[in-house]
Swiss-Prot record:
Primary site of residence: cytoplasm
Name by which UniProt lists this protein: Imidazolonepropionase
Binding site for Zn(2+): H66, H68, H236, D311
Chain sites annotated for binding 4-imidazolone-5-propanoate: R75, Y138, H171, Q239, T316
Species annotation: Acinetobacter baumannii (strain AB307-0294)
Entry's Gene Ontology cellular component terms: cytoplasm
Length: 401
């Protein structure tokens, strides 16, 4: 049956622009958009329900395309230590940092991981998020990576959201492989990835290319394995140094390369040629008090699509608000509100390979949208906090919180 959503204004975000339709209406049928346009051009039809949006602005549902939402414990004590002047290296040397999250995640049951993640993600839903990507990477062995990926699948079953899973086994070196990074990469490629993929738990494969993680050559082995399994790839690249990770990602036609503070002009050109999306993570940039900015002007000049994401994780971006990331993206990286909104809608969809079905409001696409009590879409980026969404609609059905 068809449902009519009327008396609204729409920022469709087609082609990465507001692409306004004022005095508009949307007709949904099942989980899809059946018709969208000016209300005065609405075709005569019969509707099972009519919803008056009372002049609200409507945007596509938000897409958080890079998160680590499933983890055990938190690192608030480390946050306090860093503020007292203790370095990340000192924290890591004392058993903190990612190692502490790996321990807590390994110790947690599936049920504990699921319940804690659901609390976090429900906060994000209320901010307008209708699609989320979640990475593994705190298990670092087959049993616990599998546990994380199973939890991610369960989140997609429990919540009215689109949930994509990414295997990030190549996130850090587990303690049992100390000083044996090549052996761990071999284990990922010959044991973990094939088994996890065979169980239907993996939508994409990611890795962390950095001096403190894995080299470009090691990452390439992971990419080749993913490619042989028919899985798309993504990459944490150029966050702390320039290793050419983003160019490597481009060579493998990665969906995205993420962070990118230290990428070069050649990296930008390679990503532009491959169509790889640049995912910027202002939350981590802010919390780590970084000073090296991603090359925004170069990315825009060469036509690289820019997405924004929360990078929700317990160590460097405990961010539960994607709307806050919008403001940070504009304030820190000087993106316009229009560019920032494109970064969590159509460009974020492209970073997940979902642009044909998600990310903009068009006939035939999935009916994920948010109605806002605002006078212009730029207000979504402008306001810090507050309860702006009037309605969150997922697959044509209003989400009740």
């Amino acid at each position: 049956m068809k449902k009519l959503w009327q008396n609204c204004h729409i920022a469709t975000m087609q082609n990465g622009q507001y692409s306004y339709i004022e005095d508009a209406a949307i007709v949904t049928e099942g989980h899809l958009i059946h018709w969208i346009g000016k209300q005065q051009q609405l075709p005569a039809d019969t509707y099972s329900e009519t919803v008056d949006l009372n002049g609200a602005w409507v945007t596509p549902g938000f897409i958080d395309c890079h998160t680590h939402s499933v983890f055990g414990g938190n690192r608030s004590v480390e946050f306090e230590k860093r503020l007292q002047g203790v370095s990340y290296a000192e924290i890591a040397a004392s058993g903190g940092g990612i190692a502490s999250t790996v321990r807590a995640t390994r110790e947690a049951s599936e049920e504990q991981l699921l319940n804690s993640a659901l609390k976090r993600i429900r906060c994000m839903q209320q901010d307008g998020v209708t699609t989320i990507e979640i990475k593994s990477g705190y298990g670092l062995n087959y049993e616990n990576e599998r546990k994380m990926l199973r939890v991610i699948r369960q989140i997609g079953e429990k919540l009215p959201m689109t949930v994509k899973s990414t295997c990030l086994a190549a996130h850090a070196l587990p303690p049992e492989y100390k000083d044996q990074s090549d052996a761990y990469i071999e284990h990922i490629c010959t044991e973990m990835l094939p088994k996890l993929h065979a169980e239907g738990l993996v939508d994409a494969v990611d890795a962390f290319c950095e001096h403190l993680a894995f080299s470009p050559a090691q990452v390439e082995r992971v990419f080749k394995t993913a490619q042989s399994l028919g899985l798309p790839v993504k990459l944490h690249a150029e966050q702390l140094s320039s290793l050419g990770g983003s160019s490597l990602a481009a060579r493998y036609h990665a969906l995205s390369a993420d962070h990118l503070e230290y990428m070069t002009e050649d990296d930008v050109k390679a990503m532009a040629e491959s169509g790889t999306v640049a995912v910027l993570l202002p939350g981590a940039f802010y919390l780590l008090r970084e000073t090296q900015y991603p090359p925004i002007e170069s990315l825009i000049k060469h036509g690289v699509r820019i997405a924004l994401s929360s990078d929700l994780n317990p160590g460097t971006s405990p961010a539960l608000s994607l709307r806050l990331m919008l403001n940070m993206g504009s304030t820190l990286f000087r993106l316009t509100p229009e560019q920032a909104l494109a970064g969590i809608t159509i460009h974020a969809a492209q970073a997940l390979g979902l642009e044909q079905t998600h990310g903009s409001l068009e006939q035939g696409k999935v009916a994920d949208f948010v109605a806002w009590d605002i006078e212009h879409p730029s207000e979504i980026v402008y306001w810090l906090g507050g309860d702006l969404p009037k309605r969150v609609v997922q697959h044509g059905q209003e989400v009740i919180f």
